[in-house]
Structures are given as C-alpha cells and as structure tokens.
Amino acid sequence: MEPVDPNLEPWKHPGSQPRTACTNCYCKKCCFHCQVCFITKGLGISYGRKKRRQRQRAPDSSQNHQDSLSKQPSSQPRGDPTGPKESKKEVERETETDPLD
C-alpha cells in the first residue's frame, strides 16, 4: 500500500474515486468502472425505492368474460353415477348362475 497523506480526507485519497463519472451504459467496461457500478450494473443490486406500477383499469370486455364464465354449466362428476352399482349387480348374477364345484 502506498502511504497516504494524513491531511487528506478519506474520500479524496487517490484511487478512492474513478477519474471518469459513472454512466448509464451497461457494457462490460462500464459495469467494472467502480464498485458502485459493479454492484448496481453487474450484479443488479439496488437498494433504492422501487417504483410502484400503476394498476391498469380492466376494460369493459373483461366484465363480459366474467359473465360468460358464470353462465357456463357447472362441472358434473364424470361417469355414470349408476354405473358402478350395475356392475356389482351383474357380478352377483354371474356368481348365482355359475355354481362353484
């Protein structure tokens, strides 16, 4: 390490700040410009306030879409509800007609 003049403030030490100003460019050279550029541009870390996105108002067509969903018939259970009962009856009939030896 080079000896630093004790009369200089820490932010004025040589090498503490880059010679050129930071830019909005995201090229590789600018991403490694200084520590701040590397953290914000290179790593994508920013601790500032996040801008709030304004909600977009739903157009009138979305109301019609909701209405069409409510008009659709509700889902019914799949298969014939009497199907399993009939198959049991058929099995019982087969066992009665075919005696076991």
UniProtKB/Swiss-Prot annotation:
- GO biological process terms, semicolon-separated: DNA-templated transcription; positive regulation of transcription elongation by RNA polymerase II; positive regulation of viral transcription; symbiont-mediated perturbation of host chromatin organization; symbiont-mediated suppression of host innate immune response; symbiont-mediated suppression of host translation initiation; symbiont-mediated suppression of host type I interferon-mediated signaling pathway
Which amino acid positions bind Zn(2+) 2, per UniProt? C25, C27, C30
Instruction: Write down which residues bear the modification named N6-acetyllysine.
Output: K28, K50, K51
Per UniProt, which keywords does this protein have? Acetylation, Activator, AIDS, Apoptosis, Host cytoplasm, Host nucleus, Host-virus interaction, Inhibition of host innate immune response by virus, Inhibition of host interferon signaling pathway by virus, Interferon antiviral system evasion, Isopeptide bond, Metal-binding, Methylation, Modulation of host chromatin by virus, Modulation of host PP1 activity by virus, Phosphoprotein, RNA-binding, Secreted, Transcription, Transcription regulation, Ubl conjugation, Viral immunoevasion, Zinc
Cross-link Glycyl lysine isopeptide (Lys-Gly) (interchain with G-Cter in ubiquitin) lies at: K71
The site feature described as Essential for Tat translocation through the endosomal membrane is recorded at W11
Residues annotated with Asymmetric dimethylarginine modification: R52, R53
| Spans annotated as Disordered | 48-101
Q: Note down the stretches annotated as region Cysteine-rich.
A: 22-37
Relate the protein's function as given in its record: Transcriptional activator that increases RNA Pol II processivity, thereby increasing the level of full-length viral transcripts. Recognizes a hairpin structure at the 5'-LTR of the nascent viral mRNAs referred to as the transactivation responsive RNA element (TAR) and recruits the cyclin T1-CDK9 complex (P-TEFb complex) that will in turn hyperphosphorylate the RNA polymerase II to allow efficient elongation. The CDK9 component of P-TEFb and other Tat-activated kinases hyperphosphorylate the C-terminus of RNA Pol II that becomes stabilized and much more processive. Extracellular circulating Tat can be endocytosed by surrounding uninfected cells via the binding to several surface receptors such as CD26, CXCR4, heparan sulfate proteoglycans (HSPG) or LDLR. Neurons are rarely infected, but they internalize Tat via their LDLR. Through its interaction with nuclear HATs, Tat is potentially able to control the acetylation-dependent cellular gene expression. Modulates the expression of many cellular genes involved in cell survival, proliferation or in coding for cytokines or cytokine receptors. Tat plays a role in T-cell and neurons apoptosis.
Give the domain note: The cell attachment site mediates the interaction with ITGAV/ITGB3 and ITGA5/ITGB1 integrins, leading to vascular cell migration and invasion. This interaction also provides endothelial cells with the adhesion signal they require to grow in response to mitogens.
Subunit info here reads: Interacts with host CCNT1. Associates with the P-TEFb complex composed at least of Tat, P-TEFb (CDK9 and CCNT1), TAR RNA, RNA Pol II. Recruits the HATs CREBBP, TAF1/TFIID, EP300, PCAF and GCN5L2. Interacts with host KAT5/Tip60; this interaction targets the latter to degradation. Interacts with the host deacetylase SIRT1. Interacts with host capping enzyme RNGTT; this interaction stimulates RNGTT. Binds to host KDR, and to the host integrins ITGAV/ITGB3 and ITGA5/ITGB1. Interacts with host KPNB1/importin beta-1 without previous binding to KPNA1/importin alpha-1. Interacts with EIF2AK2.
Q: Please give the name of this protein.
A: Protein Tat
- Which species? Human immunodeficiency virus type 1 group M subtype B (isolate SF33) (HIV-1)
List the top taxonomic levels of the source: Viruses, Riboviria, Pararnavirae, Artverviricota, Revtraviricetes
Q: Which gene encodes it?
A: tat
